[in-house]
Amino acid sequence: MLSYKKVLIVGRPNVGKSALFNRILDAKRSITESTYGVTRDLVEEVCKVGSFNFKLIDTGGFTILKDEISKIVVQKVLSSLEKVDLILLVLDVNEILLEDYEIIERLRKYSSKVILVLNKVDTKDKEFLAHKFHNLGFKRYFLVSALHRRGITKLRDFLKVEVGRVNIEEEVNIKVGIIGKPNSGKSTLINYLSGNEISIVSDQPGTTRDFIKTKLTRNGKVFEIIDTAGIRRRARVNEVVEYYSVNRALKVIDIVDIVFLLIDVEEELTSQDKKIAHYVTKKGKGIIIVFSKWDLLEESKGYFETLKGRVKFFFPVLNFAPIFRISVYKKIGLDSLFKEALKVKDQLELKTNTPDLNKMLNLWIKDYHLNISHKIKYITQVSTNPVKFILFANKIKNFPNSYYNYLVNNLRKIGYKNIPILVELREKIRDLK
């Protein structure tokens, strides 16, 4: 795996860390609402400046609050200080608070790699405010406005020289999104896979808000794994931040090859799980149903087979999807899960040529004994990943579902067994472009 130097952004809540993170990246990755404590996880991204790369890490706000999540966030920040090459300490140029002094004291032992970034210097008139920060003892500093992009180019150029490495692109063979309800075990899984606690693990639902990326090699292939905030029913999304997280999770589905739909084995499958599955299949993405926390279950003989039967009965939209059980703590099922993901990816990349398809189509039509007025004329595969076919018929109005399903089931038998198949019906061959 490629190794980049790491730059950690730290500071109390609402000094503009995530806005600065996005500006340095020149992309909108972290959620940046003006809500106290919005970023909770370590959000990592490779930053590209010209032909140089480094890893940029956004952190949760350093706070003196004593609730469980705040304490976990602070501990995560402190445990990261030793591991990084550079620390950007972000302060609000307009004020310095008790929490600022608290983190400054924690950074004293790392002062050689601390860069002071005074944010919210929105106009040139505010630059004079910087003088009150000189006595903090940090030799290197930058004046920026993340909101107005002031000073960002200068800071990016500095980081390029200080920690940048020549850009060598690493091929990603497969992208996997970890999707599911809050507290279904997503963060525990990605922390195990990455070897770092980059996503907060807690028994409070909704502790991951940003999406978390990590790369790993399994079976000789490079996986990019993306963990997301748990998807809730839209009716329950009553915070701006949660709204952004739900939409970001849906956007993650758009960019990955395969989704691991995590379901807590102690909970019943829900209509929300079904909605997620519908969205995934509509997009033509691979999907593997993963029952997590299997170690918590007192399993009776044959229970897993019963569970699989229930999924296929109550969720027929997923009747093609592989179903696995895992336990991160007992290391159950993880190797098999990744092997299956590679098999699904191979199916997504399968392309069957048009002459062979139409030879098989003629056989399928002959074997279909019901007498119907709808006649299939031609079939062609127009894309892979997502796999999509176009069927041309003499008419498509009131096309029988049973006939449609019969054709799809036959397509599955030629190599598309465990993936969604998109099939579009058209009436005229000349419509194909």
Curated annotation (Swiss-Prot):
Query: Which residues does the UniProt record annotate as the domain KH-like?
Result: 349-429
Looking at the record, the residues that make up the EngA-type G domain are 5-167, 174-349
The protein's matches in InterPro entries, at most eight in alphabetical order, are given as: G_ENGA (IPR031166), GTP-bd (IPR006073), GTPase_Der (IPR016484), KH_dom-like (IPR032859), KH_dom-like_a/b (IPR015946), P-loop_NTPase (IPR027417), Small_GTP-bd (IPR005225)
Example of a GO biological process term? ribosome biogenesis
Keyword Heme included in the entry's annotation: no
Q: Which residues bind GTP 1?
A: 11-18, 58-62, 119-122
Q: Which UniProt keywords apply?
A: GTP-binding, Nucleotide-binding, Repeat, Ribosome biogenesis
Pfam families reported in the protein's UniProt record:
KH_dom-like (PF14714), MMR_HSR1 (PF01926)
Q: Where does GTP 2 bind?
A: 180-187, 227-231, 292-295
UniProt xrefs under SUPFAM superfamilies: P-loop containing nucleoside triphosphate hydrolases
Q: Name one GO molecular function term.
A: GTP binding
- Domain of life of the organism encoding this protein: Bacteria
What does the annotation say about its assembly with partners?
Answer: Associates with the 50S ribosomal subunit.
Role of this protein: GTPase that plays an essential role in the late steps of ribosome biogenesis.
Q: Which PANTHER family does the annotation name?
A: GTPASE DER (PTHR43834:SF6)
Protein family (similarity comment): Belongs to the TRAFAC class TrmE-Era-EngA-EngB-Septin-like GTPase superfamily. EngA (Der) GTPase family.
Q: Which HAMAP family match?
A: GTPase_Der (MF_00195)
The protein depicted here goes by the name GTPase Der
